[in-house]
Amino acid sequence: MTPTTENFTPSADLARPSVADTVIGSAKKTLFIRKPTTDDGWGIYELVKACPPLDVNSGYAYLLLATQFRDTCAVATDEEGEIVGFVSGYVKRNAPDTYFLWQVAVGEKARGTGLARRLVEAVLMRPGMGDVRHLETTITPDNEASWGLFKRLADRWQAPLNSREYFSTGQLGGEHDPENLVRIGPFEPQQI
């Protein structure tokens, strides 16, 4: 099902939840996608902890994402308000046509609903994102879920997908798998 966009006015008060800007309906559940708020920081942290193999950042980092980067991040909540999905990223300052996706997490009970794709697309369809023509991220070689998501996005948007080694194991302290830089694009906003 295609997400439906509701009228959305961001709240000037970051502590207040915003009205859902995207509603996803399915036979199983209704999920709401919106910008994160201060109150979401710890819930995002707990979600990411429950989604291996994702790197877990500090609770403070997720609070910063929920406030300082809220325009380029999104959370998905279920009807009870539990956070079941999260995407973080930013528009690159040195390449304003590129959105760098830092992390995407989908909780177990929301997997298989296409939520990861919908989170990414919800961010890219927001006002102010119209110049974005490329999507980048880094993915470890064995993260099948992330590779699958990016391949599906490239196919859906009819855009090329390229990858190359970005950070080696040595650059990551020898205790982390290498990260490949993965790039989709160019694509047109109407393809999203």
From Swiss-Prot:
Family matches, as InterPro entries: Acyl_CoA_acyltransferase, Ectoine_EctA, GNAT_dom
Domain N-acetyltransferase as annotated: residue spans: 31-192
Residues that span the membrane, as ranges: none
EC numbers, comma separated: 2.3.1.178
Taxonomy, superkingdom: Bacteria
Record-linked Pfam families: Acetyltransf_1
One BP term from GO: ectoine biosynthetic process
Transferase as UniProt keyword: yes
Keyword annotations of the record: Acyltransferase, Transferase
MF GO annotations: diaminobutyrate acetyltransferase activity
Leading EC class: transferase
This protein's pathway: Amine and polyamine biosynthesis; ectoine biosynthesis; L-ectoine from L-aspartate 4-semialdehyde: step 2/3
Family: Belongs to the acetyltransferase family. EctA subfamily.
NCBIfam families referenced in this protein's UniProt entry, alphabetically: ectoine_EctA
The name this protein goes by in its record: L-2,4-diaminobutyric acid acetyltransferase
Organism: Chromohalobacter salexigens (strain ATCC BAA-138 / DSM 3043 / CIP 106854 / NCIMB 13768 / 1H11)
Gene: ectA
